[in-house]
């Protein structure tokens, strides 16, 4: 994969140069307070390296979906404040509804080596998501070097992820993207076998391409979560009122056939935990087999299924997981997700990669994050990467 061999911040001289860094500061805010700092922590190594090498560091990011207008509640001001505390030095916030207006120009003109400026939310400008040249040029006018360290938006061709870099002398990746390419890339390109992929989450339709692609590569494919019921239906089981994409049942049959032809061990639920309504206090009932009673919905994997999944995980040398096994937000239906996370965390001689999104949230929430080889910072991006797609934000960077 040519995407794996990209120049990094360590391959270029940054001293005294203005460096525009696209970070992923799309963090959850409550009353102006950041409630989850994972993404800020992820950005620190790159920022600290650039400061230590005497670069003039200009940070940019989007936050939420302001849809091309200035929305005070989506300002990056709280991020500048928190970053200042984390770095132990002032991060100057260029409050500027135009992102690259007078304030931003003033803040970036008088920078000394090692200074840090954070620009306002790039999606305040409607041009951002359309990758329009005028905004890309404005962003580029502030700097000499472009660094992309936002894996979470690497699958988007926007001004701040792709466009701005085209007008600068050098385009490299930061540590975060470098790590993503190393672990996600290596896991898929050269896995130590047995290689097991675990897919969960609500929809088969979100993961059509990824199922197809992984069947070319894996030894075992585990399917759980809401998407499993479409496969169970394809096997002829009753699914009650469980999540079901009836128009994807044929596709599920094709994938089961493909797994057989490729010699891939496809693991599906053999029992589930069901309830008669969707709520945290719903009574969990374990089914005898994979059939769900009429008017009941499957909300988690059953004990026999979990035992099968865990056994396969324990025999693996590479495990990639994307999407929860059940409604892990409800304690009564979190056992499948918890058991998979624990089994992966207990592997000592294996590469374990969590593919962002809900599974990353689940693993961090359950306290297993630091036991994994790598927890990806990108949900959609990691899925597209696993599909073997070229990600625009990475393709645009200079090759080594």
Curated annotation (Swiss-Prot):
Which BP terms from GO are recorded? gluconeogenesis; glycolytic process
Give any Gene Ontology cellular component: cytosol
- Show the InterPro entries listed in the entry: Phosphoglycerate_kinase, Phosphoglycerate_kinase_CS, Phosphoglycerate_kinase_N, Phosphoglycerate_kinase_sf
Q: Where in the cell is it found?
A: Cytoplasm
Q: Which residues bind substrate?
A: 24-26, 39, 62-65, 123, 156
Main subcellular localization, coarse class? Answer: cytoplasm
Quaternary state and interactors: Monomer.
Q: Which family does it belong to?
A: Belongs to the phosphoglycerate kinase family.
User: Which stretch is the leader sequence?
Assistant: none
Protein's pathway = Carbohydrate degradation; glycolysis; pyruvate from D-glyceraldehyde 3-phosphate: step 2/5
Q: Which reaction does it catalyse?
A: (2R)-3-phosphoglycerate + ATP = (2R)-3-phospho-glyceroyl phosphate + ADP
Could you tell me the EC number(s) of this protein? 2.7.2.3
PROSITE patterns given in the database record: PGLYCERATE_KINASE
The record's Pfam families line, in alphabetical order, gives: PGK
Q: Where does ATP bind?
A: 207, 298, 329, 356-359
Q: Which UniProt keywords apply?
A: ATP-binding, Cytoplasm, Glycolysis, Kinase, Nucleotide-binding, Transferase
GO function terms (MF aspect): ADP binding; ATP binding; phosphoglycerate kinase activity
Q: What is this protein called?
A: Phosphoglycerate kinase
Organism encoding this protein: Clostridioides difficile (strain 630)
């Amino acid at each position: 994969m040519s995407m794996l061999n990209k120049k990094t911040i360590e391959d270029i001289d940054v001293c005294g140069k203005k460096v525009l860094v696209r970070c992923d500061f799309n963090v959850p805010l409550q009353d102006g307070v950041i409630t989850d700092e994972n993404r800020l922590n992820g950005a620190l190594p790159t920022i600290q390296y650039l400061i230590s090498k005497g670069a003039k560091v200009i940070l940019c990011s989007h936050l939420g979906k302001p849809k091309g207008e200035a929305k005070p509640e989506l300002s990056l001001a709280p991020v500048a404040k928190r970053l200042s505390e984390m770095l132990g030095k002032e991060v100057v916030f260029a409050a500027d509804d135009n992102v690259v207006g007078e304030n931003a120009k003033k803040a970036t003109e008088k920078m000394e080596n090692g200074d840090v400026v954070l620009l306002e939310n790039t999606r305040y400008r409607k041009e951002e998501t359309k990758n329009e040249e005028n905004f890309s040029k404005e962003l580029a006018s502030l700097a000499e070097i472009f660094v992309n360290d936002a894996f979470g938006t690497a699958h988007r061709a926007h001004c701040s992820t792709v466009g701005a870099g085209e007008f600068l002398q050098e385009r490299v990746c930061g540590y975060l993207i470098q790590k993503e390419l190393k672990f996600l890339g290596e896991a898929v390109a050269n896995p130590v076998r047995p290689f097991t992929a675990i897919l969960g989450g609500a929809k088969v339709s979100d993961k059509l391409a990824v199922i197809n692609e992984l069947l070319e590569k894996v030894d075992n494919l585990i399917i759980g979560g809401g998407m499993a019921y479409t496969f169970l239906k394809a096997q002829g089981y009753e699914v009650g009122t469980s999540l079901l994409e009836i128009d994807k049942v044929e596709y599920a049959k094709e994938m089961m056939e493909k797994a057989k032809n490729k010699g891939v061990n496809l693991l599906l639920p053999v029992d589930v935990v069901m309830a008669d309504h969707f709520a945290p206090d719903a009574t969990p009932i374990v089914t005898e087999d994979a059939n769900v009673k009429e008017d009941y919905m499957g909300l988690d994997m059953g004990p026999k299924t979990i035992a099968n999944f865990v056994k396969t995980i324990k025999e693996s040398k590479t495990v990639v997981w994307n999407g929860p096994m059940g409604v892990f937000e409800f304690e009564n239906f979190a056992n499948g997700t918890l058991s998979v996370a624990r089994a992966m965390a207990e592997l000592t001689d294996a590469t374990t990669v969590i593919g962002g999104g809900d599974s990353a949230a689940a693993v961090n929430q359950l306290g297993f994050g630091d036991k994994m080889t790598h927890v990806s910072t990108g949900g959609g991006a990691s899925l597209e990467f696993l599909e073997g797609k070229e990600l625009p934000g990475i393709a645009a960077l200079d090759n080594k």
